[in-house]
Amino acid sequence: MKRILTSLCALFVCLNIIAQGWPAGYGGVMLQGFYWDSFDDSQWNVLEKKANDFSGYFDLVWVPQSGKAAATKSMGYDPLYYFNQNSSFGTEAELRSMISTFKNKQIGTIADVVINHHGTNNGWFGFPAEVYKGVTYQNLSTDVCADDDGGAAATEARKTGTQLSQNNDEGEGWGGMRD
């Protein structure tokens, strides 16, 4: 019985590995360069100093979202700005320097961005405008899913006379950000 269970477990693990959908022939290794509340350990200049240690072992370093967030200490999942790259992890110049150093060591960089999360700076629907290359971008209340936050957004919209999108959220509800 023990052999059967061990064999089934081994088969299950192998099937899960195959199901991951990795590109054929991919031999790279990615390092997650952050963890929850890793503001000090994941500073751009701290990661950059580790490039020699990473080189030869890791092909990619996965870094936190680099845009300016609503909170001073933020993992980036409450983004206010996508083009302002001064975040809890450092400045835009430090980010660019880290990426350049990684490139020189043949290490790629991949950012953890949850594009449907949007922080606000003035109530539930106060999204700031952002100008990039002469074009102004701004989320509106009509960009917020009709059933966002399990109906809490709709309740707030009714109280303030605000219109939401007619579309429902297709993912899991989460009360931390407007979707």
Region annotations inferred by a language model:
Residues 2-10:
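Sec-dependent signal peptide recognition
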Residues 3, 17-21:
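Bacterial Sec-dependent N-terminal signal peptides
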Residues 21-52, 56-60, 64-179:
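Substrate-binding/active-site clefts of carbohydrate-active enzymes
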